Amino acid sequence: MRDLQARIIHELNVRATIDPAAEVVERVDFLVRYVRAAGASGFVLGVSGGQDSSLAGRLCQLAVERLAEQGVAAEFIAVRLPYAVQNDEDDAQLALSFIRPERTVAVNIQRGVEGVGNEYRDALGEDMTDFAKGNVKARVRMVAQYAIAGQRRLLVVGTDHAAEAVTGFYTKYGDGGADLLPLSGLSKRQGRALLQHLGAPARLYEKAPTADLLDQSPGQTDEANLGLRYSDIDDFLEGKDVAEKVAIAIEARYLATEHKRRVPASMFDDWWTGGGFGR
């Protein structure tokens, strides 16, 4: 195993093999213990219809049910956050039918995103790029979730897992902003195994993952964006041998996105002196 590969696996807490049933129990227990320690009233999570939010959502609902068994009143709000009309709305509804949240609400982010875009144009005399606008979409979605969380004393749940963390494939202070991460340490295929254990419809974990943030490239897959296959990323994270060019590409993305995995830098930090900057 490569030295940096071993360090990454350790830092991201990835296990080479897992027991899906035990992982579900452990992660639900984490959610239960954390919400009680925080003195919060439950969870809020944006549900898109993909693998990650489907899994995180089901874990949240199971945690709320566990809390009820312990005599603790808690709620879980699943939030639909479309930009105008979501092309894969059927998948989102399928995810909700699997998650079975106690409450579902919808916040259309289009006016918020366009408002930021209009103010940007007025202030700087230019339009945002499609990439910048995509990041605004992710950040407005998180603003909406924190508005709900702040009003109702809930915790915002993130969907980041090891395969995203190693590549930095999320928007800083967008989908990368959350109070807790119940999928942390899982590779993509391990998350899929948990969904299979939980009886999720195959569509939710077989569809090609996509952030779907770009107007000019709707439905662009994560793998096309990354230039890497999740199967290779998973092999790397699980300590398996991968082609050298693949390992180099993964390690380069990890080093370039270190800033995303850190709290804001201060003059007392030194992690940034060795690099750690990317998109």
Swiss-Prot record:
Residues that bind deamido-NAD(+): 139, 172, 179, 259-260
Pathway involvement of the protein, from the record: Cofactor biosynthesis; NAD(+) biosynthesis; NAD(+) from deamido-NAD(+) (ammonia route): step 1/1
Record's catalysed reaction(s): deamido-NAD(+) + NH4(+) + ATP = AMP + diphosphate + NAD(+) + H(+)
One GO location term (cellular component): cytoplasm
Gene3D superfamilies tied to this protein: HUPs (3.40.50.620)
Subunit structure, interactors included: Homodimer.
Cited function: Catalyzes the ATP-dependent amidation of deamido-NAD to form NAD. Uses ammonia as a nitrogen source.
UniProt-recorded name of the protein: NH(3)-dependent NAD(+) synthetase
Organism the protein comes from: Leifsonia xyli subsp. xyli (strain CTCB07)
